[in-house]
UniProtKB/Swiss-Prot annotation:
Superkingdom field: Viruses
Organism: Mastomys natalensis papillomavirus (isolate African multimammate rat) (MnPV)
One Gene Ontology term from the biological process aspect of the record: DNA-templated transcription
InterPro entries, per database record: E6 (IPR001334), E6_sf (IPR038575)
Function, in words: Plays a major role in the induction and maintenance of cellular transformation. E6 associates with host UBE3A/E6-AP ubiquitin-protein ligase and modulates its activity. Protects host keratinocytes from apoptosis by mediating the degradation of host BAK1. May also inhibit host immune response.
Name of the gene encoding the protein in the UniProt record: E6
Main subcellular location: host cell
Transmembrane annotation, as ranges: none
Family affiliation: Belongs to the papillomaviridae E6 protein family.
Protein name: Protein E6
């Protein structure tokens, strides 16, 4: 079973524009921009029977918000996270707390520079990406 939109359309031998991928939560078909964002965010396709499903941008944001609200464990500055978890900046896996995109090393540093704490949610670290950062 394919895990990415890219590998799925390659296996099917169809152009990305022809793919109709429903959202797991709202059943709306993802737009071309959302298909790109899906792979960019490193999400995995969900398979129900022989049908693949993704997640639209709106539902990803709602899921991120609910996850943070319902499953927040603690929040700490980046330096504390790296020290306590015995990780390097490259070894720290973190997603955006708003859109769920995987944070780059630069984005992790930008969070620390802004003084933003990293939130532990269901055992995973979250902070804001450069697109979702507070203005």
């Amino acid at each position: 079973m394919d895990r990415t939109v890219h590998s799925f359309v390659e296996r099917l031998g169809i152009p990305r524009e022809d793919l109709l991928l429903p959202c797991t939560f709202c059943s709306r078909f993802l737009t071309q921009e959302e298909l790109t964002a899906f792979d960019f965010s490193a999400f995995n396709l969900v398979w129900r029977g022989r049908c693949a499903h993704g997640i639209c941008t709106a539902c990803a944001r709602v899921c991120a918000s609910l996850d943070l609200f319902l499953h927040h464990q603690n929040s700490r500055p980046l330096a504390d996270v790296l020290r306590d978890e015995n990780l390097t900046l490259h070894g720290l896996k973190a997603r955006c707390r708003v859109c769920m995109k995987i944070l780059s090393v630069t984005e992790k540093l930008e969070c620390a520079e802004r003084g933003e704490s990293f939130a532990k949610v269901r055992g995973q670290w979250r902070a804001r990406c450069r697109i979702c950062k507070p203005v």
